[in-house]
Amino acid sequence: MDLRFVQQLECVPDTEGGEAAFVVLEQIVEKGAKRRFGCIGKIEKNRLAHEFELIRATDTAKLFLYWADIVAAIRQKIYPYIYSVQNCSLVCYCLGITEVNPLLAGSYFERLLTRRSTHVPILFIEVPKGRGREASESLGGEVKSLIEIEENAALPDLDPIDVMDFFKRATFENRELLQSAAASLGLAGQKPLETVRALADLLVYKRYKEFMDEKPSLLYQEDAVDLLVKAGLSYEEAECARRAFAMKNRAEIDCCRNAFERAARKNGYSIGEANAIFSAVEKEINFTVCRASYVAMAQYLYMNTFLQDKTKG
């Protein structure tokens, strides 16, 4: 494991040591999964098992427990909006850290954590204007570098109970609400929206309109990684390639290209086909964004529209 990663992880409060922390995490996640899903299906079980494997391999159980404690503490007074890569984790969803189900968002856990991670993921939290100091009181000084809290004047200062009640029953399937949410940002088009993921797409196009003239074929990081995985890489290998592309680390990119060519050839791709796929992903990676983060934005927008309509009613 990378020494930088280990040193950063040492800053996290260790309420349960080593294996004990992992056991506690499993127990809390199991309760959370039952609360989220009722009956835990095979897909959910397999995803949780995969995430637990990587959490154990990176010895980060206490990190997930700490995130859950911090979010719960802030939520006692303020609703914390989470837009960061924790939205890619089913463990985080079951812990109540995020309200995004990564299975529905089509996101992969390795976007958050891999065996080759060099830095502990930062938890980014946004709170309404004027509530930052109050939210920061929940953090210990030694771990402030691992959690960032920012104020956002555009966020409504809602009662956390109202927000949690909404997410307990939300299906995000009301087409009128989806259209109203899009219209509130000037995004409503001729084609009716049917899903919160479609609303997320509109949010991406609005924020990155200047890039869209390039007509990128890839919109999300998840799409880029899926292309590499389908050709033969594991999700960990594909995520390492994505990060190398984003950092423009030529030595690492060349290493990933060699690994990709070997894997693709085993799956029946020619060298030319493999190079074309790899080069296309490298070219377009900077156009892509994390789908799970934009699904979170879309869900919050839908929620705000619902609560505003409820108040008017």
Set out the residue ranges of the language-model regions.
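Alpha-helical scaffold/interaction cores of sigma-54-like transcription cofactors
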Residues: 1-313
